[in-house]
Amino acid sequence: MSSTALKSGKISAYAAVKVDPDGDYCTPGAFDLERLFWKGSPKYTHVNEVWPNLYIGDEKTALDRYSLEKAGFTHILNAAHGRWNVDTGPEYYSDMNIEYHGVEADDLPTFNLSPFFYSAAEFIHTALQNETSKILVHCAMGRSRSAALVLAYLMIYKNMTVVDAIDQVLQHRCILPNRGFLKQLRELDIKLALERRDNMNGTNSSEKTGTSTETEI
C-alpha cells in the first residue's frame, strides 16, 4: 500500500498496509486474515479461556447459571444481546454476583461492530483489573461476534496486532469472525498502528494523514 493511498484515507480491504516504513509489520489484507484461520485450532467446545481470566463461550454456557456461579464468573459480555438473539440481559443474572454488559449485534458481514470495540474492550479491561474477576464473552456460538470483541480488546489494551491477537485466541479456541468483522478489525489495526507510530514521533495521526482511514469494500 502506497503512502499516497494511506494519506488519502482510502484503503483497499484486500491490500496489505505498512504504516511504519521502518518497521517489519504489515496489516494483512482481508483474504490473508481469513487464511490465518485455515491452519487449525483446538476442537470446538462450549467455552475456553483465551487470556488469563478471559473466556469466550456460547449461548449454552451463558444460560447455565449454575455452572457460571460454580466457575466463579463475575462479569458477562453478551455480544448477541437482544430479543432475537441470546435474550438474557442483566435481569437474567440479577440474583447472582455478575456484572452484565450487552452488545446488540447481528452476525452478518454487513453489520458494523466497530462502534462497540472500545466500549466492550473497556468493560473487559475494567473487569480484569481485579485479579479475582472472571469474564465470559459470548454470543450464540462463541466464534464470530464474541471473538471479534475479544480480538479488539487484545489489540486496544494489550497492544497486539490483529495477527498476534488472532494467533493468541486460536491457540485456545476455534473461532471464525465473519469477513465483515475481519475488515473492521483490520481497520482498527491500521488505526492503532498509526497511533503507535505517531506517539513515537510526537505527532497526531489525523494531522499527519489529513483524514481518518476508510476501507474500500
Swiss-Prot record:
Its EC number is 3.1.3.16, 3.1.3.48. CDD domains: DUPD1 (cd14575). Keywords: Cytoplasm, Hydrolase, Nucleus, Protein phosphatase. One of its GO terms (molecular function) is protein tyrosine/serine/threonine phosphatase activity. SUPFAM superfamilies: (Phosphotyrosine protein) phosphatases II (SSF52799). Residues 46-194 form the Tyrosine-protein phosphatase domain. GO terms for cellular component: cytoplasm; nucleus. InterPro entries: Atypical_DUSP_subfamA, Dual-sp_phosphatase_cat-dom, Prot-tyrosine_phosphatase-like, Tyr_Pase_AS, Tyr_Pase_dom, TYR_PHOSPHATASE_DUAL_dom. It catalyses: O-phospho-L-tyrosyl-[protein] + H2O = L-tyrosyl-[protein] + phosphate; O-phospho-L-seryl-[protein] + H2O = L-seryl-[protein] + phosphate; O-phospho-L-threonyl-[protein] + H2O = L-threonyl-[protein] + phosphate. It is found in: Cytoplasm; Nucleus. One of its GO terms (biological process) is negative regulation of MAPK cascade. The active site is at 139 (phosphocysteine intermediate). Dual specificity phosphatase able to dephosphorylate phosphotyrosine, phosphoserine and phosphothreonine residues within the same substrate, with a preference for phosphotyrosine as a substrate. Involved in the modulation of AMPK and MAPK1/2 signaling pathways. This is Dual specificity phosphatase 29.
